[in-house]
Amino acid sequence: MHIIIDATTTQDQFAFAGVGQYTKNIILALLKNNATIQFSILRFKNKISTLDKDISKYKNAQLVDIGEYKINDYKNNIWYFTQVLPVIKKIRRKDSIFFSPYFWRNYPADIMPTILFVHDMNLALFNMYSQQSPIHNQIRKVQYWNAMNKSTKCKYILSNSQTTKNDYLKYYPQYPSEQVEVTYLGITVEERNISLDKYLPSDYKERQYLIYLGGGINRSKNSIGVIKAYKEFLNLRKQNGADLTKAPYLVIAGGQFQNTEKPEVQELIEYIKENNLQKHVIFTGFYEDKYAYSLLHNSFAYIHLALYEGFGISTGEALRAKVPTILHKSPVYEEIFSETSLLVDGLNEQETAKAIYDVYVNPEKYKNMIERGYTKSLDFTWDKCAEKTFKVFQKVA
């Protein structure tokens, strides 16, 4: 068996998002656990990859250049047919299988056995193919469906939850459901507490903080809902006579929130200014992976109000960090985290604020939930994910 894998999402704008993290971790786990199998890893030439630190230790990995770096955009198909497909045809063997961890850059399901990982149907459900402009949205919509429709030619579809599987089959009811395999993702956060002085105010230990980590700036992430709920939480404290100058911070972690050219980021900043929250809301900017555990573990609660998710890696990390989790009552969170988290209507800031307040003033009440969450998080490993993935490879071989 020979496995060809597209690893470009470890190098492009998705490298530190869920898509890129999945690609990195599933490749490393597959290499580690299948030493006798030859893997060809497709990568851009002269471009840093999140795989660079670890992949050199695996002798069963052949790194294959596919040309200079190209951003993931509307020109994907031109790049695929002129740069990538010729390389695939050159290196494929009779026993080759192609594994595509993401669909946007196209994949050779029409010429060889292919397995595609579907992370979610978010873009289709929210008609959110591009946030650049309505024209860009239409262009990307056409590209999206051209790429996604090709998935019906794949031998198998992998998905990160039963929710994603169900959503995929709603759009493609003709695809055999038994050939859509659910493989929950892994949680890799290192349980090590390190100083947060470079990211947080000096008084964060005294004032405490609510953390929003692993979010995004598209509409379905509902980042504005987090800030609105936090504002209502402050109002609850004020009603109960608390000094707001000593109120817990809202910490928003992630480099994407620094891109002030994005209308979605501008909306957040404007709301913060309009409601005089500048001294209460802290943006960490980009943070190294090694700080994720400490950012989570030292918070009094983690909040994620995304209206739709495929899985929720950062939520799993929060469970591992033993922090109460407050989540929007979305299908996937009900599927995976209903017994380990507080589920709320993320579009109702008053309801969400009451949940935040209760966790803040009654921490003892949530100790059992925290322990259940930690135990649950241990179920999610990349070794398990890779094992199920490789079994699908074997079915196709």
Where on the chain are the PLM-derived regions?
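Carbohydrate transferase catalytic cores enriched for Leloir-type hexosyltransferases
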Residues: 1-397
